[in-house]
Amino acid sequence: MPQVFIETPRLILRQWKETDHEPFIVLNGDKEVMEFFPVVKTREESLSQIERFVINIRTMGYGFFAVERKDNAQFIGFTGFAHPGFDSYFTPCVEIGWRLSKPNWGQGYATEAAGSCLEYGFETLSFCEIYSFTSVHNKSSEQVIIKTGMIKQGLFEHPDIEEGSILRQHVLYKKVESNR
């Protein structure tokens, strides 16, 4: 049984297990799920990503956790924390992010998972502030950010996205420990 970090009324956020690999590969290869990312991920890239997630959780006690529905024990995506690997006026920082499979969109799972993760970040991990960002075109993800109570900080050009790409401009949000 993988280590559970967070439980919500409908979800379990936990360490990754081998049975997550195939659905994660499908998730990362879904063009609609990956619409606001520069490219879909290959099988090898997805497996490498899982390996990094597992190592981060083991070594730091946090990272991107696998998200599982309680009602059917189905892997539906991930949510959790990372340290963006690019230079910007707000980095270094802790970022919260998520990605869920399309059949699980529109049911409040992303907000439930992200909200509980934010609480875990402040109460258990003692983070002082947590950022989130997404493409200005990703209105669904931005709505999740807003629903978790994060405060808009402005816009920035994502340095890892090619200049001229419609995905380059991002909206930035932040939540600080005192405004939870």
Report residues per predicted region.
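Acyl-donor (CoA/ACP) binding surface of acyl/acetyltransferases
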Residues: 1-35, 51, 68-180
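Conserved GNAT-fold acetyl-CoA-binding loop/helix
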Residues: 32-53, 63
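Short loop/turn motifs at secondary-structure junctions and domain boundaries
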Residues: 56-60
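Glycine-centered flexibility motif
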Residues: 61-63, 80
